[in-house]
Amino acid sequence: MKNRIILLLLILAGAIATQAQRSQPLFPQTPGMVSFTYRNSFAKDVAATLDTLKALGITDMEFSNLFGSTAPAIRQMLDDRGMFCSSFGVSYADLTTKISEVGVNAKALGAQYVRVAYIPHEGPFTLDMAKKVVEEFNKAGKLLKEEFGITYCYHNHGYEFVPYGGGTLMDYLIEQTDPKYVSFEIDILWSFIHGQDPVKLIQRYPTRFKLLHLKDLRKGATLNTSGGTAVENDVALGTGQLDIPAILKEAKKAGIKHYYIEDESPAYARQVPQSMAYLRGL
């Protein structure tokens, strides 16, 4: 009898623990925001746009532009509103030719990361291009880390998923760059649209991804390898083709800390609140 009671108590405890796990939200934090989402608004008035974002509950920013202002001025605007810039996006040209200026601006913004989202190229991305990029990334990442204490991240844009060996040139970029100096930001839409599974990509390189762009692809939009798609194909999270919960579970397991909504659609002002409500409901 005593053993039966103990067994029942253990079963009950397990059921309670399982229910508690299920009731915990998958994404309890407020997501960050990529400034590119509100690029037209930022170009007109940085302070007013920050007010709009703060009213939505956004505090974590990834700036992709200084919008005619300066890094110290934007930092002050952020501080005044209880907001912060965790990542600073720059062009490949600036990374490779103005690295010290990039580091100074990133430091002034208070950013922990510097990010490049696109490698200029004509035609298909090639192994020779990838080899040059690896060299440049290692060089820039080393300087940013050693002189500024900042981590460099590369944001995939899809064209890197050209087949190479047993994988792709994205695998080559990840495997050939020095993990001490180069990390990555996974854009889940640009991974998915090129036939990749973001979950498997994170599983393959769980320690290399530090940042994540939250996006969804319109149902019916076709996959392609061009590195581009119509901006109207960006839709509110949870209404498109991507398995957002599965991606978030794997990203959390990998320890990714910063998640930024990026919505390139003209309907971003309507879709961003929808995306945030969706994340709260997970």
Stretches with model-predicted labels:
Residues 62, 87-89, 115, 153, ...:
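Conserved beta-strand positions in the central sheet of alpha/beta enzyme cores
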Residues 1-25:
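Bacterial Sec-dependent N-terminal signal peptides
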Residues 38-44, 60-72, 90-98, 121-125, ...:
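Acidic-and-aromatic substrate-binding clefts and catalytic sites of carbohydrate-active enzymes
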